[in-house]
Protein backbone atom coordinates (compact mmCIF):
# COMPACT_ATOMS: atom_id res chain seq x y z
CA UNK A 1 0.00 0.00 0.00
CA UNK A 2 1.45 3.34 -1.07
CA UNK A 3 2.39 5.76 1.67
CA UNK A 4 0.24 8.89 1.44
CA UNK A 5 2.08 12.10 0.69
CA UNK A 6 0.53 13.77 3.74
CA UNK A 7 -0.87 11.99 6.79
CA UNK A 8 -2.43 14.09 9.54
CA UNK A 9 -3.57 12.76 12.91
CA UNK A 10 -5.23 14.62 15.80
CA UNK A 11 -3.88 17.96 14.63
CA UNK A 12 -4.88 21.22 16.28
CA UNK A 13 -3.57 24.71 15.72
CA UNK A 14 -4.19 27.67 18.02
CA UNK A 15 -3.63 31.33 17.18
CA UNK A 16 -3.66 33.91 19.97
CA UNK A 17 -5.45 31.48 22.22
CA UNK A 18 -8.16 30.71 19.65
CA UNK A 19 -8.43 27.28 17.94
CA UNK A 20 -8.28 27.84 14.18
CA UNK A 21 -7.78 24.31 12.87
CA UNK A 22 -8.77 20.87 14.13
CA UNK A 23 -8.20 17.77 11.97
CA UNK A 24 -8.85 14.32 13.40
CA UNK A 25 -7.54 12.37 10.42
CA UNK A 26 -6.67 13.30 6.86
CA UNK A 27 -4.55 11.73 4.14
CA UNK A 28 -3.60 13.34 0.83
CA UNK A 29 -2.31 11.22 -2.07
CA UNK A 30 0.66 12.14 -4.23
CA UNK A 31 0.50 13.32 -7.80
CA UNK A 32 -3.09 14.54 -7.84
CA UNK A 33 -4.98 17.80 -7.54
CA UNK A 34 -6.71 18.51 -4.22
CA UNK A 35 -9.08 21.45 -3.99
CA UNK A 36 -9.92 23.10 -0.66
CA UNK A 37 -13.12 25.13 -0.44
CA UNK A 38 -14.39 27.22 2.45
CA UNK A 39 -15.54 30.72 3.39
CA UNK A 40 -13.20 33.44 4.63
CA UNK A 41 -11.85 32.58 8.06
CA UNK A 42 -12.46 28.85 7.67
CA UNK A 43 -8.77 27.97 8.09
CA UNK A 44 -7.68 27.46 4.47
CA UNK A 45 -4.57 29.65 4.70
CA UNK A 46 -3.60 28.13 8.04
CA UNK A 47 -3.90 24.63 6.61
CA UNK A 48 -1.69 25.52 3.64
CA UNK A 49 0.97 27.12 5.87
CA UNK A 50 1.11 23.95 7.95
CA UNK A 51 1.17 21.74 4.84
CA UNK A 52 3.93 23.97 3.46
CA UNK A 53 5.93 23.57 6.67
CA UNK A 54 6.00 27.30 7.20
CA UNK A 55 4.49 26.86 10.68
CA UNK A 56 4.46 24.05 13.21
CA UNK A 57 1.04 22.81 14.43
CA UNK A 58 0.23 23.46 18.06
CA UNK A 59 -0.41 19.75 18.64
CA UNK A 60 -0.83 16.54 16.68
CA UNK A 61 1.01 14.67 13.97
CA UNK A 62 1.81 15.88 10.47
CA UNK A 63 3.72 13.36 8.37
CA UNK A 64 5.20 14.03 4.95
CA UNK A 65 6.00 10.96 2.88
CA UNK A 66 5.58 8.87 6.02
CA UNK A 67 7.97 10.88 8.19
CA UNK A 68 7.59 13.83 10.57
CA UNK A 69 9.06 17.08 9.31
CA UNK A 70 9.75 20.43 10.95
CA UNK A 71 9.21 23.86 9.37
CA UNK A 72 11.88 24.68 6.78
CA UNK A 73 13.60 21.31 7.36
CA UNK A 74 15.92 20.19 4.52
CA UNK A 75 13.81 17.10 3.80
CA UNK A 76 10.83 19.26 2.82
CA UNK A 77 12.34 22.63 1.89
CA UNK A 78 13.40 21.44 -1.57
CA UNK A 79 10.23 19.44 -2.22
CA UNK A 80 7.34 21.65 -1.05
CA UNK A 81 6.60 25.25 -1.96
CA UNK A 82 3.76 27.60 -1.05
CA UNK A 83 2.41 30.50 -3.09
CA UNK A 84 0.57 32.72 -0.57
CA UNK A 85 -2.33 34.93 -1.54
CA UNK A 86 -0.10 38.03 -1.38
CA UNK A 87 3.39 36.81 -2.26
CA UNK A 88 6.46 38.89 -1.50
CA UNK A 89 8.83 39.97 -4.26
CA UNK A 90 12.27 41.32 -3.48
CA UNK A 91 13.27 44.77 -4.72
CA UNK A 92 15.23 43.24 -7.54
CA UNK A 93 14.73 42.42 -11.19
CA UNK A 94 12.30 39.76 -12.31
CA UNK A 95 15.24 37.53 -13.25
CA UNK A 96 16.75 37.77 -9.78
CA UNK A 97 13.42 37.08 -8.12
CA UNK A 98 12.73 33.99 -10.22
CA UNK A 99 16.31 32.68 -9.91
CA UNK A 100 16.58 33.28 -6.15
CA UNK A 101 15.48 29.79 -5.11
CA UNK A 102 17.99 28.11 -7.40
CA UNK A 103 20.81 30.35 -6.20
CA UNK A 104 20.29 29.62 -2.52
CA UNK A 105 20.33 25.93 -3.47
CA UNK A 106 23.61 26.62 -5.31
CA UNK A 107 22.08 25.35 -8.55
CA UNK A 108 23.36 27.88 -11.06
CA UNK A 109 23.66 25.79 -14.23
CA UNK A 110 21.89 27.29 -17.26
CA UNK A 111 20.26 29.84 -14.96
CA UNK A 112 19.09 32.33 -17.60
CA UNK A 113 17.64 29.55 -19.75
CA UNK A 114 15.72 28.11 -16.79
CA UNK A 115 14.37 31.54 -15.85
CA UNK A 116 13.21 32.03 -19.44
CA UNK A 117 11.34 28.73 -19.36
CA UNK A 118 9.74 29.42 -15.97
CA UNK A 119 8.52 32.80 -17.18
CA UNK A 120 7.11 31.22 -20.33
CA UNK A 121 5.03 28.89 -18.13
CA UNK A 122 3.17 31.91 -16.78
CA UNK A 123 2.89 33.73 -20.10
CA UNK A 124 5.71 36.25 -19.64
CA UNK A 125 8.38 36.86 -22.27
CA UNK A 126 11.84 36.97 -20.69
CA UNK A 127 13.01 39.48 -23.30
CA UNK A 128 10.45 41.95 -22.00
CA UNK A 129 10.39 41.06 -18.30
CA UNK A 130 13.69 39.53 -17.12
CA UNK A 131 15.39 42.87 -16.41
CA UNK A 132 12.26 44.69 -15.29
CA UNK A 133 12.28 45.77 -11.60
CA UNK A 134 9.62 44.18 -9.43
CA UNK A 135 8.05 47.56 -8.57
CA UNK A 136 7.22 48.09 -12.27
CA UNK A 137 4.93 45.05 -12.41
CA UNK A 138 1.15 45.10 -12.30
CA UNK A 139 -0.61 43.01 -9.67
CA UNK A 140 -1.28 40.18 -12.09
CA UNK A 141 2.29 40.24 -13.44
CA UNK A 142 3.73 40.18 -9.91
CA UNK A 143 1.62 37.14 -9.03
CA UNK A 144 2.78 35.37 -12.18
CA UNK A 145 6.43 36.16 -11.41
CA UNK A 146 5.96 34.79 -7.90
CA UNK A 147 4.52 31.60 -9.36
CA UNK A 148 7.40 31.33 -11.85
CA UNK A 149 9.80 31.56 -8.89
CA UNK A 150 8.12 28.43 -7.49
CA UNK A 151 7.83 26.57 -10.79
CA UNK A 152 11.53 26.96 -11.59
CA UNK A 153 12.19 24.64 -8.64
CA UNK A 154 10.00 21.88 -10.17
CA UNK A 155 8.48 21.20 -6.74
CA UNK A 156 7.02 17.87 -5.72
CA UNK A 157 4.19 19.75 -3.99
CA UNK A 158 2.81 23.16 -4.96
CA UNK A 159 0.42 24.78 -2.49
CA UNK A 160 -1.66 27.64 -3.88
CA UNK A 161 -3.57 30.00 -1.59
CA UNK A 162 -6.25 31.88 -3.57
CA UNK A 163 -3.86 32.21 -6.53
CA UNK A 164 -6.29 34.22 -8.68
CA UNK A 165 -8.11 36.27 -6.03
CA UNK A 166 -6.55 39.66 -6.73
CA UNK A 167 -5.53 39.50 -10.38
CA UNK A 168 -7.04 40.35 -13.75
CA UNK A 169 -8.87 37.73 -15.80
CA UNK A 170 -5.98 37.11 -18.20
CA UNK A 171 -3.49 36.59 -15.37
CA UNK A 172 -5.96 34.33 -13.57
CA UNK A 173 -6.26 32.06 -16.60
CA UNK A 174 -2.48 31.95 -17.12
CA UNK A 175 -1.87 31.13 -13.44
CA UNK A 176 -4.41 28.31 -13.55
CA UNK A 177 -2.95 26.93 -16.77
CA UNK A 178 0.62 27.07 -15.43
CA UNK A 179 -0.27 25.16 -12.27
CA UNK A 180 -2.05 22.44 -14.24
CA UNK A 181 0.87 22.21 -16.68
CA UNK A 182 3.26 21.60 -13.76
CA UNK A 183 1.03 18.77 -12.59
CA UNK A 184 0.93 17.23 -16.08
CA UNK A 185 4.63 17.68 -16.91
CA UNK A 186 6.26 16.82 -13.58
CA UNK A 187 3.60 15.00 -11.58
CA UNK A 188 3.54 17.85 -9.08
CA UNK A 189 0.90 17.44 -6.38
CA UNK A 190 -1.32 20.52 -6.32
CA UNK A 191 -3.22 21.61 -3.22
CA UNK A 192 -5.34 24.63 -4.13
CA UNK A 193 -7.48 26.80 -1.87
CA UNK A 194 -9.77 28.97 -3.94
CA UNK A 195 -13.12 30.76 -3.99
CA UNK A 196 -13.39 29.69 -7.63
CA UNK A 197 -15.11 26.45 -6.63
CA UNK A 198 -16.42 25.82 -10.14
CA UNK A 199 -12.86 25.71 -11.49
CA UNK A 200 -11.77 23.48 -8.61
CA UNK A 201 -14.58 21.03 -9.31
CA UNK A 202 -13.52 20.87 -12.95
CA UNK A 203 -9.80 20.19 -12.36
CA UNK A 204 -9.54 18.49 -8.96
CA UNK A 205 -9.33 14.78 -8.23
CA UNK A 206 -10.66 15.51 -4.73
CA UNK A 207 -12.42 18.55 -3.29
CA UNK A 208 -12.51 19.06 0.48
CA UNK A 209 -14.80 21.42 2.37
CA UNK A 210 -13.33 23.36 5.29
CA UNK A 211 -15.55 25.23 7.73
CA UNK A 212 -14.62 26.71 11.11
CA UNK A 213 -11.31 24.86 11.06
CA UNK A 214 -12.74 21.40 10.35
CA UNK A 215 -12.82 19.34 7.18
CA UNK A 216 -16.07 17.71 6.23
CA UNK A 217 -17.36 16.18 3.05
CA UNK A 218 -15.59 15.36 -0.17
CA UNK A 219 -16.93 17.98 -2.52
CA UNK A 220 -20.30 16.68 -3.67
CA UNK A 221 -22.26 18.20 -0.81
CA UNK A 222 -23.94 21.57 -1.03
CA UNK A 223 -23.13 23.96 1.80
CA UNK A 224 -25.67 26.60 2.77
CA UNK A 225 -24.69 29.14 5.41
CA UNK A 226 -26.92 30.76 8.02
CA UNK A 227 -28.42 32.65 9.64
CA UNK A 228 -31.30 30.22 10.30
CA UNK A 229 -34.65 31.27 11.73
CA UNK A 230 -37.32 29.55 13.79
CA UNK A 231 -40.59 30.03 11.94
CA UNK A 232 -44.01 30.53 13.50
CA UNK A 233 -45.05 26.94 12.70
CA UNK A 234 -42.11 25.59 14.71
CA UNK A 235 -39.97 24.71 11.69
CA UNK A 236 -36.44 25.94 11.07
CA UNK A 237 -35.24 27.38 7.80
CA UNK A 238 -33.96 30.27 5.76
CA UNK A 239 -35.98 32.73 3.70
CA UNK A 240 -34.20 33.39 0.43
CA UNK A 241 -34.00 36.73 -1.37
CA UNK A 242 -36.90 35.95 -3.71
CA UNK A 243 -39.17 34.65 -0.95
CA UNK A 244 -38.48 30.94 -1.42
CA UNK A 245 -38.22 28.98 1.82
CA UNK A 246 -35.36 26.61 2.45
CA UNK A 247 -36.51 24.34 5.26
CA UNK A 248 -33.98 22.62 7.51
CA UNK A 249 -33.70 20.48 10.60
CA UNK A 250 -32.91 22.31 13.84
CA UNK A 251 -29.41 23.80 13.63
CA UNK A 252 -26.94 23.65 16.53
CA UNK A 253 -26.52 27.43 16.26
CA UNK A 254 -28.25 30.06 14.16
CA UNK A 255 -25.10 30.66 12.08
CA UNK A 256 -24.28 26.99 11.43
CA UNK A 257 -23.55 25.66 7.93
CA UNK A 258 -26.04 23.17 6.50
CA UNK A 259 -24.69 20.22 4.52
CA UNK A 260 -27.28 19.25 1.91
CA UNK A 261 -26.00 16.06 0.30
CA UNK A 262 -28.94 14.74 -1.73
CA UNK A 263 -30.37 17.37 -4.06
CA UNK A 264 -32.30 15.99 -7.02
CA UNK A 265 -33.36 17.48 -10.32
CA UNK A 266 -37.10 17.16 -10.93
CA UNK A 267 -37.47 16.03 -14.53
CA UNK A 268 -35.34 18.92 -15.74
CA UNK A 269 -38.26 21.32 -15.40
CA UNK A 270 -40.61 22.84 -12.87
CA UNK A 271 -42.53 20.13 -11.01
CA UNK A 272 -43.34 19.00 -7.48
CA UNK A 273 -41.54 16.66 -5.11
CA UNK A 274 -43.35 13.52 -4.05
CA UNK A 275 -42.15 12.78 -0.50
CA UNK A 276 -43.80 14.32 2.55
CA UNK A 277 -40.42 15.52 3.83
CA UNK A 278 -39.24 16.74 0.43
CA UNK A 279 -38.90 20.45 -0.26
CA UNK A 280 -38.58 22.08 -3.65
CA UNK A 281 -36.58 25.04 -4.84
CA UNK A 282 -36.54 26.78 -8.20
CA UNK A 283 -33.38 28.09 -9.80
CA UNK A 284 -31.48 28.76 -13.01
CA UNK A 285 -28.67 26.68 -14.46
CA UNK A 286 -25.62 28.93 -14.67
CA UNK A 287 -22.94 26.50 -15.78
CA UNK A 288 -22.36 22.93 -16.95
CA UNK A 289 -18.87 21.52 -16.45
CA UNK A 290 -17.37 18.09 -16.97
CA UNK A 291 -15.95 16.61 -13.75
CA UNK A 292 -12.40 15.40 -14.15
CA UNK A 293 -12.67 12.55 -11.67
CA UNK A 294 -16.04 11.02 -12.62
CA UNK A 295 -16.67 12.01 -16.24
CA UNK A 296 -20.11 13.25 -15.18
CA UNK A 297 -21.45 16.77 -15.58
CA UNK A 298 -21.63 19.16 -12.65
CA UNK A 299 -24.56 21.54 -13.04
CA UNK A 300 -24.29 24.84 -11.17
CA UNK A 301 -27.69 26.23 -10.26
CA UNK A 302 -28.36 29.63 -8.72
CA UNK A 303 -31.35 29.65 -6.36
CA UNK A 304 -32.14 33.21 -5.27
CA UNK A 305 -28.45 34.03 -4.95
CA UNK A 306 -27.55 30.71 -3.29
CA UNK A 307 -25.24 28.57 -5.48
CA UNK A 308 -26.08 24.86 -5.52
CA UNK A 309 -24.67 22.03 -7.59
CA UNK A 310 -25.81 18.60 -8.68
CA UNK A 311 -23.91 15.95 -10.63
CA UNK A 312 -25.69 14.35 -13.57
CA UNK A 313 -24.82 11.75 -16.22
CA UNK A 314 -24.00 13.20 -19.62
CA UNK A 315 -26.91 11.26 -21.10
CA UNK A 316 -29.39 13.02 -18.81
CA UNK A 317 -28.03 16.40 -19.85
CA UNK A 318 -28.71 15.52 -23.47
CA UNK A 319 -32.08 13.85 -22.95
CA UNK A 320 -33.52 16.69 -20.87
CA UNK A 321 -31.92 19.43 -22.97
CA UNK A 322 -30.32 21.11 -19.98
CA UNK A 323 -28.35 24.26 -20.69
CA UNK A 324 -27.22 27.45 -18.91
CA UNK A 325 -30.13 29.84 -18.52
CA UNK A 326 -32.77 27.13 -18.18
CA UNK A 327 -35.08 27.25 -15.15
CA UNK A 328 -35.29 23.99 -13.21
CA UNK A 329 -36.75 22.68 -9.98
CA UNK A 330 -34.77 20.84 -7.33
CA UNK A 331 -35.87 18.67 -4.43
CA UNK A 332 -34.13 17.76 -1.19
CA UNK A 333 -35.09 15.88 1.96
CA UNK A 334 -34.91 18.42 4.78
CA UNK A 335 -34.60 15.95 7.74
CA UNK A 336 -31.43 14.53 6.14
CA UNK A 337 -29.57 17.85 6.41
CA UNK A 338 -26.35 17.61 8.44
CA UNK A 339 -24.68 20.47 10.26
CA UNK A 340 -21.07 21.61 10.23
Regions found by a protein language model. Give the residues of each.
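The feature captures the beta-strand-to-loop junction immediately N-terminal to the Walker
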Residues: 37-39
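Helix-to-loop junction immediately C-terminal to a conserved catalytic motif
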Residues: 52
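ABC ATPase NBD coupling module
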Residues: 67-81, 104
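Conserved ABC ATPase "signature" region
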Residues: 110-128
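Conserved ABC ATPase signature
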Residues: 133-137, 141
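Catalytic Walker B motif of ABC-type/P-loop ATPase nucleotide-binding domains
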Residues: 158-162
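Glycine/charge-rich catalytic "coupling/switch" loops of P-loop NTPases
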Residues: 242-289, 318-340
